[in-house]
Amino acid sequence: MPEANPFESLQEQLDDAGEFLDVNADVLERLKHPERVLETTLSVEMDDGTIETFKAFRSQFNGDRGPYKGGIRYHPGVTRDEVKALSGWMVYKTAVADIPYGGGKGGIILDPEEYSDSELERITRAFATELRPFIGEDKDVPAPDVNTGQREMNWIKDTYETLEDTTAPGVITGKALENGGSEGRVNATGRSTMFAAREVFDYLDRDLSDATVAVQGYGNAGSVAAKLIADQGADVVAVSDSSGAVHNPDGLDTRAVKAFKTETGSVSGYEGATEELSNEALLTMDVDLLVPAALENAIDEDLAHDVDADVVVEAANGPLTPDADDVLTERGVTVVPDILANAGGVTVSYFEWVQNRQRFQWTEDRVNEELEAIITDAFDAMTDAHEDAGTPNLRTAAYVVAVQRVVDAYEGSGSWP
């Protein structure tokens, strides 16, 4: 079966939401396409003196509610359509969380494992130079994504500020604390995933503390979500990364697994596991809660028939294909969509941006409290829409909320020119 095109998946999700909204078809069509996409070729000198070229993208999908917002990823699988889709999901992620941003996304086609730190710095600074006319504190605010982090964000900030001869810490988020970052940012996506899991179990009149949990993907989002969900009393019985999965029916020590992965580079071989499994086996385990926290399209239509979890909370972006989503809906599996569950990252990025503009630092407790309030309010808005509009699932309900907010902003601004 061919892999689903993520941009087409986004458009299908918007069409699904449109069936429950009184929105002009032309306006909805406008919301299905990016306003602009930058595609550029970076020519960068390698350590050995040779020149290598890299294809890079930045999609600015929609800015009706505020500056474009979204991460930059480094991955050999980056495509133009993927970047467009991810930038679109950011529009609706910021809207469902009701924070004043639009959506953007960027990426470079490369495997960072194949390059030295100095080469990655030159690649990053070359991309930042190309982005310079398009980004800014009130224009487009990038952030980390797959295979990028504080280091890369610091390089982009420094490049922008040097070229612009200014101080603009809010031009980028996800920075190190000493470079204007925010407390709580590193754990934010995993924390919002935990809040979403807690809220959906409460909504279903179930207790998260009694749940068994499997987490696919043990990077930042997955490992933090696993740790915080375990702190709620749940038994995290299986986790995985690209090397495979480890399982213990009595529960894994999530912190010990993270320490083992940090030391060895993978979860495979963790001595606290009773068996090792494939990623596919983890996705079809008999558990109460499944948390996909890896890349897009982890669960397709065929695999969805074998998913044995009662609840799926999407820590990753687009881990279900639309057909898989339909299968899980038909089977009665409750799915909390990515645009709400993993919105912690962009929400705390917003907090970082606010702190940068105020030149004032919040405490971690304040960050976490504000994040919890936004995620719980967003969850309530989603479930209200689900019940009031009669949507088939929570994903469509989340898009109903988000699309309506974007449409209201667009129509309220009038036409120009």
Curated annotation (Swiss-Prot):
Pfam families, per database record: ELFV_dehydrog, ELFV_dehydrog_N
Enzyme class: oxidoreductase
InterPro entries in UniProt: Aminoacid_DH-like_N_sf (IPR046346), Glu/Leu/Phe/Val/Trp_DH (IPR006095), Glu/Leu/Phe/Val/Trp_DH_C (IPR006096), Glu/Leu/Phe/Val/Trp_DH_dimer (IPR006097), Glu/Leu/Phe/Val_DH_AS (IPR033524), Glu_DH (IPR014362), NAD(P)-bd_dom_sf (IPR036291), NAD_bind_Glu_DH (IPR033922)
Domain of life: Archaea
Catalytic activity: L-glutamate + NADP(+) + H2O = 2-oxoglutarate + NH4(+) + NADPH + H(+)
Keyword hit for Oxidoreductase: yes
Active-site residues (renumbered): K105
Keywords associated with the record: NADP, Oxidoreductase
Note: Strain NRC-36014 contains 4 distinct glutamate dehydrogenases while strain NRC-1 contains only 3.
Assembly and interaction partners: Homohexamer.
Membership in a protein family: Belongs to the Glu/Leu/Phe/Val dehydrogenases family.
This protein's name: NADP-specific glutamate dehydrogenase A1
UniProt source species: Halobacterium salinarum
The organism's taxonomic lineage, starting at the top: Archaea, Methanobacteriati, Methanobacteriota, Stenosarchaea group, Halobacteria
Chain's gene name: gdhA1
